[in-house]
Each structure stands twice: as structure tokens, then as C-alpha cells.
From Swiss-Prot:
Its main location: cytoplasm. It comes from the Bacteria. This is Proline--tRNA ligase. Keywords: Aminoacyl-tRNA synthetase, ATP-binding, Cytoplasm, Ligase, Nucleotide-binding, Protein biosynthesis. The gene is proS. GO terms for cellular component: cytosol. Belongs to the class-II aminoacyl-tRNA synthetase family. ProS type 1 subfamily. It catalyses: tRNA(Pro) + L-proline + ATP = L-prolyl-tRNA(Pro) + AMP + diphosphate. The keyword Nucleotide-binding applies. The keyword Lipid biosynthesis does not apply. One of its GO terms (molecular function) is aminoacyl-tRNA deacylase activity. Consists of three domains: the N-terminal catalytic domain, the editing domain and the C-terminal anticodon-binding domain. It is found in: Cytoplasm.
């Protein structure tokens, strides 16, 4: 490719609203162009990178037995009604009407669509298992699109779905796809982790995330320093903590505690640890057609994990869509006093009460007395009936691993893939069944598997690039080599550059010849910005010495290559990381 023919509209400065370096570099280097909030055009350089990512994905998925299809981006809303997700998914689901007043959605995921296909065409266990996948555009109407391709509204996704006759077959495919994803991300040259995760709006019994470690990541993962335990903070677990020695033993009594509304201030008032203070967190629960209140109790030195809390509510049948923090008006209407909320008589004020599992059968607790400026001491939870316990706390750094007691640490990460065991939920709601070996009708066991293809552009750059511009990995750079002519007006330099260009092309090197009538410094700046893997300099010294200066983009390391060894050395450098 000649640079003079390449459509790569680089900018002098990155967009003012760009925060992440990946967003800055992709926009400034002419990879992407924003046309609306969270909506981007992919220009030739970005398309080359996308094609490479997609080719790797196709190769690995098909090696693992998956078949490529292409489903409609527009789906009947009635399918989403049948699955129950039309209301559950929320405002991120874009719903519209056609001219005949039919309701449709722009797909953020395609569980309903693929399940309908299976229901219509898979009739017997003899056709199972089957794994179908696609790479296609998706749309999620994010409330705050940001960070360029990291949280866009329109994005490119690889999503796959598998159908099975039993849970054992699903388990095998879950691990098979996990292996495929590991190979894909390894081929892309990424440092990643596999972590246990929440299934979210997609649902299912088990899910794992594939996350790229980067300080700009939106997610926090909890990693054991001693074993391979890793989980998204939303579902991370810990070992039971040892009880502090300073136990506030007391007879059950009510004490005046003026102006002590925090767990820390209550602990200081009674000269004990926040561990023994029962902290109440009230949340407004949003249902499909109503709002209620829930109170969650954790120890005073713990924090509530909102995702765990929402899941705990739904396990007991709340059918909650989301949680919001209850404000002072909400508390006043319920007859509650912030800072003094406790379990005594609480059922008449809120619809749901859940205690963290770490509190089970705890005694010597200090709790709010549901009376302004009063707390109760010497409280024993064994004296209460029918309490609901669940894991609802957010794991802290220095907590201990649930598997080996090792120390837990936080890491920032960016999710790039997710695999789920969906079970029979979608099959039952959409009446997708087959006949088993005994001729009996059974519902499909389903798996769901996704990779954010367009997000991977940002993930690679967040992990690999520097302040100068894009640094791509071995298998993702838009070009292997850019040949930079020091002085294009020197016919000898120009002639040699074109000869070298042809020599490299014949060896299968994806080369870019910078034949633009521009300053040498500007050309090198574009090399740093765009991120070809190597820059080969053709200058006056090259003509005299028959040696080329070659620069690696990853570390800007310079190397001298003799003309006679040019192709061999370039291929060696490209073969290495």
C-alpha cells in the first residue's frame, strides 16, 4: 500500500472529550470517526485491525466446532416479551415501531432469536449438540456512552449459543469455548484473566468473564495472591473472618447515643470495633409496576455489594429490576430514622430484610433501636425468627481467599469476553424443545458466549500503547512495516524505497510505503501515532553504506540491517513479539 493512496485522516490533536489513551489515539490516528454519541465509523486502518481480530476469532471458534451464521440485527419485540426481558432489560434496549405499528428491538444480545431458530429446526437429540455463532453489529442505548469504543452504544460483537440435551453436555461445551477464548486472546497478545462473574440481565446459573488487566478498566476484579482464585468484585467471596478480641459483652439494653449515626461513631461511643455494629442500608427496590423498600444488614466495617444485594432479593422472589439508594424522603415515609435503623419491629417499615451471611447466629451486636439517638446493645440474632441470610458484602483488599486463605487484592480490568451457562430458562419461556432418546419432549440446555470485537481495539491499546500513539500486538497491527524515505526528491532514495517495498511484498510482508511529499519528521510522527510494527528508514546513509535503520514501534529500539540480510532480518523481527 502506498501512503499517498491510504485514507488515514490523522488529526493534529485528539478530541477534547477523549479521556482514555485508546480513544485519543484511535481518533487522532484516523482509525475511527465519531458520528454521534457512542456511535463510530471505522475507517480503513481500524477495519484492517478488526479484520485481523475477526479472522483469529473465526479460526479458533471453528477449530473448536462452532459454526458461523449471521442473524438479523432487528428482532420482533414479541420474542423479548415471551422471554420476559422486554421489561427487565431496561432503557438500554432500543424499541421502535415500523410503519405497520409492529414493535421491534435493536439487538443488544440475541438469545431470543437463536432460541427461536433452534425451536423451529432442532427436533431430535440426534441433532445435538450444536454451537452457532456470529460476528455482527449490536446496539445498547447506554445512558452515558464514554471512553470511545470501550462503552459505545453501537458495537461489534462475536456472540455464540450452544444447544444441548443435558447439563453434562453443556458443561463440556462451556469448557470447550473457554479454551477457544483463551486461544483467541493469547493470539491477540493480551495479558488477561478468567474470573467468576455475575450473569446480569442475560441470566443463567454460572458465568465467567475474560478481562484484560489495565489501569483504565471499568471493572474491579479480586485476585488471590497465593492461588488462581479470581472473581469480579460483584460476586467475589472471602473466608469467614476471625472475630476481634475486644467483644462488647453486655446485657440486652437500650442506650442513648446522641449524634452517632455512622458505624464508626457508634463503635467509638461504645469503645469497641465497627465489626460488632450492625450497619443498615436501605434501598428503594424498582419492580416492573411498583417500588418497595429493602433493608440490608452488614457488619459496620463492611460495605454492601449492590449486585449481590439485587441477586439476593430475586432469589427470595422479589422480581426486582434494580436498586436505588433510599433518600431522606423515602425513609421518612417509611417511618425510619437514618443512622438508627435496626431489626426490631422493622418488618412493618420495609418489604424485604436481608442479613449478610457473616452475621448468622451472631451475638454481642450493637444495633439501631429505630428511635432517634438510641441504639440497643447485647443483641443476639439467634433471638429473631425466620431471618434471611445471603452473601451481600463487597470483598475488601486484605480479606482472605475462600479457597486457600491467601490475601485478596484488587486489580482494575476491562471485560472483553463473557461465557454463560443459561440452562433451560430461554428454552422454557420460548417453548424450545426436542425429543430425547426415549421419545420424550425435553427443553434445551443452553450456553451463551460473547466477545467484544470492537472493544478489543481499545483493550489492546490500553494495555500496550504509549503516550506517543498506538502500539499493536504481533497479530493486530494494520501494517507490518512502513518504509520511510528520508528525502523523496532524491531519486536514488525513492528508487531504492520502491525496490525494497516490492522485495518485502514478495516475502508476504504487509508493507506500507510512505511516498508522501512531507517532512521526514512528520512521517516519523505518523509512524509513532499509527503504530506499524516496524519503520524501515531509506536515506542518504543507506545509499552509501547499504544498511538500513529499522525501528521497532513497541519500544522504539533501533537496529541496523544490511541490505543483503534485509528480508531475513525483517521476517525474524516480525516473527518475534
Amino acid at each position: 500500500m502506498l501512503f499517498s493512496k491510504l485514507f488515514a485522516p490523522t488529526l493534529k490533536e485528539p478530541p477534547k472529550d477523549a479521556v482514555l489513551k485508546s480513544h485519543k489515539h484511535l481518533a487522532q490516528a484516523g482509525y475511527i470517526y465519531q458520528v454521534g454519541s457512542g456511535i463510530y465509523n471505522f475507517l480503513p486502518l481500524a477495519k484492517k485491525v478488526l479484520d485481523k481480530i475477526e479472522n483469529i476469532t473465526h479460526k479458533r471458534m471453528q477449530e473448536h466446532g462452532a459454526q458461523n451464521i449471521l442473524m438479523s440485527f432487528v428482532v420482533l419485540a414479541s420474542l423479548w416479551e415471551k422471554s420476559g426481558r422486554l421489561d427487565k432489560y431496561g432503557k438500554e434496549l432500543l424499541v421502535f415501531k415500523d410503519r405497520k405499528d409492529n414493535d421491534f428491538v435493536l439487538s443488544p444480545t440475541l438469545e431470543e432469536n437463536i432460541t427461536e431458530i433452534a425451536a423451529n429446526f432442532i427436533k431430535s437429540y440426534k441433532q445435538l449438540p450444536v454451537h452457532l455463532y456470529q460476528i455482527h453489529t449490536k446496539f445498547r442505548d447506554e445512558i452515558r456512552p464514554r471512553f470511545g469504543l470501550v462503552r459505545a452504544r453501537e458495537f461489534i460483537m462475536k456472540d455464540g449459543y450452544s444447544f444441548h440435551e443435558d447439563a453434562e453436555s453443556l458443561d463440556k461445551e462451556f469448557l470447550n469455548t473457554q479454551s477457544a477464548y483463551k486461544e483467541i486472546l493469547s493470539d491477540l497478545g493480551l495479558d488477561f484473566r478468567i474470573v467468576e462473574a455475575d450473569s446480569g440481565a442475560i441470566g443463567g446459573s454460572k458465568s465467567r468473564e475474560f478481562v484484560v488487566l489495565t489501569e483504565c478498566g471499568e471493572d474491579t476484579i479480586v485476585v488471590c495472591q497465593n492461588c488462581d482464585y479470581a472473581a469480579n468484585i460483584e460476586i467475589a467471596k472471602r473466608s469467614k473472618r476471625p472475630e476481634p478480641l475486644n467483644v462488647p459483652k453486655a446485657q440486652l439494653a437500650k442506650f442513648p447515643t446522641p449524634n452517632t449515626t455512622s458505624a464508626q461513631s457508634v463503635a467509638e461511643f461504645f469503645k469497641t470495633e465497627p465489626y460488632f455494629v450492625l450497619k443498615a442500608l436501605v434501598r428503594k427496590v424498582i419492580h416492573k409496576d411498583k417500588e418497595t423498600l429493602a433493608c440490608f444488614f452488614v457488619r459496620g466495617d463492611d460495605n454492601l455489594e449492590e449486585v449481590k444485594a439485587l441477586n439476593a432479593l430475586n432469589i427470595i422472589g422479589a422480581n426486582a429490576l434494580e436498586l436505588r439508594e433510599a433518600n431522606e424522603e423515602d425513609l421518612n415515609k417509611a417511618g425510619l430514622i437514618a443512622g438508627f435503623i435496626g431489626p426490631y419491629g422493622l418488618k412493618k417499615h420495609v418489604s424485604y430484610i436481608i442479613f449478610d451471611e457473616d452475621l448468622k447466629e451472631s451475638d454481642c451486636l450493637i444495633v439501631g433501636a429505630n428511635e432517634k439517638d438510641f441504639h440497643a446493645v447485647g443483641v443476639d440474632l439467634k433471638g429473631f425468627e425466620n431471618l434471611v441470610y445471603a452473601d451481600i458484602v463487597q470483598v475488601k483488599e486484605s480479606d482472605r481467599c475462600p479457597n486457600c486463605q491467601g490475601e485478596l487484592k484488587y486489580h482494575k480490568s476491562l471485560e472483553v469476553g463473557h461465557i454463560f451457562k443459561l440452562g433451560q430458562g430461554y428454552a422454557k419461556s420460548l417453548k424450545a424443545s426436542f425429543l430425547d432418546k426415549n421419545g420424550k419432549e425435553q427443553f434445551f440446555e443452553m450456553g451463551c458466549y460473547g466477545i467484544g470485537i470492537s472493544r478489543l481495539l481499545s483493550a489492546i491499546l490500553e494495555q500496550k500503547s504509549d503516550d506517543l500513539g498506538c502500539v499493536w500486538t504481533k497479530n493486530t497491527a494494520p501494517f507490518d512495516v512502513v518504509i520511510v524515505v528520508s528525502n523523496l526528491k532524491d531519486e536514488a532514495q525513492k528508487k531504492l524505497a520502491f525496490e525494497v517495498y516490492e522485495r518485502l511484498l514478495q516475502k508476504g510482508v504487509d508493507a506500507l510505503l510512505d511516498d508522501r511529499d512531507a517532512r521526514f519528521g512528520a512521517k516519523m510522527r505518523d509512524f509513532e501515532l499509527i503504530g506499524e510494527r516496524l519503520a524501515l528508514i531509506v536515506g542518504k546513509q543507506t545509499l552509501e553504506s547499504k544498511e538500513f535503520e529499522c525501528i521497532k514501534r513497541a519500544n522504539l529500539e533501533k537496529q541496523t540491517i544490511k541490505d543483503i540480510e534485509l528480508e531475513e532480518k525483517i521476517l525474524e523481527m516480525l516473527a518475534s513479539e
